[in-house]
A protein has these predicted regions:
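P-loop NTPase motor domains
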Residues: 1-103, 118, 128, 178, ...
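Conserved ATP-driven motor cores of ASCE-family P-loop NTPases powering translocation/secretion/packaging/pilus
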Residues: 95-197
Length: 258
């Protein structure tokens, strides 16, 4: 059928024919696994969705069967452009159970409507299982409305004065307390680009400055700081990779005794 058409590609069949990932061992030791997909072609997104589904299920089973319910090493999944990965089967149920196994997930979206388009009625369940919500800015109406409602209301003092000018001059003052949205939708929409809103379950929301990544002690190790730090996949794919003229390479001399 059409859904299996990608498997007509020999390279994909080769990748899927055997296991080199050892996903079940990620919770045993510190591991960094990067899943990189095209942001313009969604043909192979289902592969990453399948991998993540297997990852969650394998780690949950291993936590239960071998470690008494919790993995020895915390596993954090940072799912950037989550809506473009493809639908992960039963994710609304997985996200409710993984935390007890020492697994967490950070879902990164352009707007909440992306999640609802992908997961339909299950989107609210997924959002409800996220203890922390970090809003970096945007102007999508549904997201703005939900953020405003999430922040809640504040109490303000309202004074009304009235004055009548006639033969008998009168003056009136009315005082009352009323509720107002902590931040209205239009206030959130025009929020300064250097600000963010952080909501943690059980705590009042924070209106804060975004962290300046250039001040991080390890920023110097990123390719943004120095191009020579950029990971070159060609080196892994081609053992006889020849560095380009502008690349800096480290030469190590090893003397072998006879």
């Amino acid at each position: 059928g059409a859904r299996l058409a990608p498997f007509d590609i020999a390279e994909l069949r080769e990748i899927m024919s055997y296991d080199e990932m050892e996903l079940d061992k990620i919770g045993d030791r510190k591991t960094a696994l990067f899943l990189i997909m095209s942001d313009t072609d969604t043909t192979f997104n289902f592969v990453i969705a399948m991998l993540q589904s297997q990852l969650f299920n394998l780690l949950c089973d291993k936590a239960d069967d071998e470690y008494g319910g919790r993995l020895p090493v915390h596993v954090r999944v940072i799912a950037d452009e989550f809506a473009n990965i493809g639908q992960i089967p039963q994710f609304d149920k997985l996200i409710a159970t993984i935390r007890s196994r020492e697994i967490s997930a950070s879902i990164i979206l352009q707007s909440q409507s992306q999640l609802k388009a992908m997961y339909k009625d299950s989107a609210d369940t997924i959002l409800g299982n996220c203890d922390t919500t970090l809003f970096l800015g945007g102007k999508e109406k549904t997201t703005l409305k939900e953020m405003s409602e999430l922040l809640g209301k504040e109490t303000i003092d309202l004074y009304n004065t009235s004055e009548t000018r006639s033969n008998q001059k009168s003056f009136g003052l009315n005082y009352q307390k009323t509720g107002k949205q902590l931040m209205t939708e239009d206030e959130i929409a025009v929020m300064d680009g250097g600000k963010c809103i952080l909501q943690i379950r059980g705590a009042r929301p924070f209106f804060s400055d975004k962290y300046d990544i250039t001040k991080h002690k390890n920023y110097r190790l990123l390719a943004d700081e120095n191009e020579k730090n950029r990971y070159k996949v060609e080196k892994e794919l081609n053992p006889q990779y020849t560095p380009k003229s502008e690349e800096e390479v480290e030469v190590i001399h090893v003397e072998l005794s006879e």
